[in-house]
């Protein structure tokens, strides 16, 4: 039996070694099929990253499918049961790097649009694709640059589905209608280097920092809300000392991270951190990196369309969650867009033997098409 259109495109995409930020020709495959549907294609290359913006129609509302063609490295190939770039079906599961994150979703999007346009060639509004090869990497020259370009010419996305793997047990059981923000602090606490036998003429920055770090770790930053858990504070990295047992270090470097809800702002978190550090009389330098702001789509046409589409296909409404890490949805949401993440099961993403259920890909295609029916038919 021949492959379905979704499975055929998924296999073509998965056979290309598009390890971030490489695209390896994946976008060409998508563009070819979209051009045949009357999409106008705009390729945007920023340094080592390839992106494209495709649009069909010039009316509102503007609905966008967003995703990425890059994948994470495979890891040790000896731990894979199959070649990660030779898509293989075993017991109904499609194995390949990127099967779930997120080339499977990309195939579903394209085929869903093909079917929808065939049935509704004069559909309402406009359909677009925002695709990047820089989601798994530093995310500097990908979606965020395309969004900047669109905003500069006042081309604003109204509604967007990001194809990130949102599901847990079966496709569509969970959709993400928001994400927490991420704020990283790089803190250097300064002391005076010296001999451990003479602490009175040195100043140990590790000892000095510990009470402040303890307070930061136990502070309740907010209580969250109906959609988000309370803001969390974690220290993932800490480095100080020369490696010798008889030297008091002159500095200690601490990296900390907030995953924050819509109940807190960047300014509020930064101000409270500085207040705590100053209260403990530390000599320090502190630099901040805003990795992403929180977003939430708690109402609106898109949320209704997605929930109803999943219910139509699965005969069960999805659970709405905001858990997990960040995604490119955070950049699109800053346009004021309604953003929802709907994609395959995420159990094997970034792991060896990454896989996706073949039947789930067909269901996801149906869901995406039903969303278009609900919004633009």
Curated annotation (Swiss-Prot):
Keywords: Amino-acid biosynthesis, Cobalt, Diaminopimelate biosynthesis, Hydrolase, Lysine biosynthesis, Metal-binding, Zinc. Its EC number is 3.5.1.18. It catalyses: N-succinyl-(2S,6S)-2,6-diaminopimelate + H2O = (2S,6S)-2,6-diaminopimelate + succinate. Zn(2+) 1 binds at residues 68, 101, 164. The active site is at 70, 135 (proton acceptor). Pathway: Amino-acid biosynthesis; L-lysine biosynthesis via DAP pathway; LL-2,6-diaminopimelate from (S)-tetrahydrodipicolinate (succinylase route): step 3/3. Binds 2 Zn(2+) or Co(2+) ions per subunit. Gene3D superfamilies: Zn peptidases. One of its GO terms (biological process) is lysine biosynthetic process via diaminopimelate. It comes from the Bacteria. One of its GO terms (molecular function) is succinyl-diaminopimelate desuccinylase activity. Its cofactor is Zn(2+); Co(2+). Zn(2+) 2 binds at residues 101, 136, 350. Catalyzes the hydrolysis of N-succinyl-L,L-diaminopimelic acid (SDAP), forming succinate and LL-2,6-diaminopimelate (DAP), an intermediate involved in the bacterial biosynthesis of lysine and meso-diaminopimelic acid, an essential component of bacterial cell walls. Homodimer. Belongs to the peptidase M20A family. DapE subfamily. This is Succinyl-diaminopimelate desuccinylase. It comes from Aliivibrio fischeri (strain ATCC 700601 / ES114) (Vibrio fischeri). The gene is dapE.
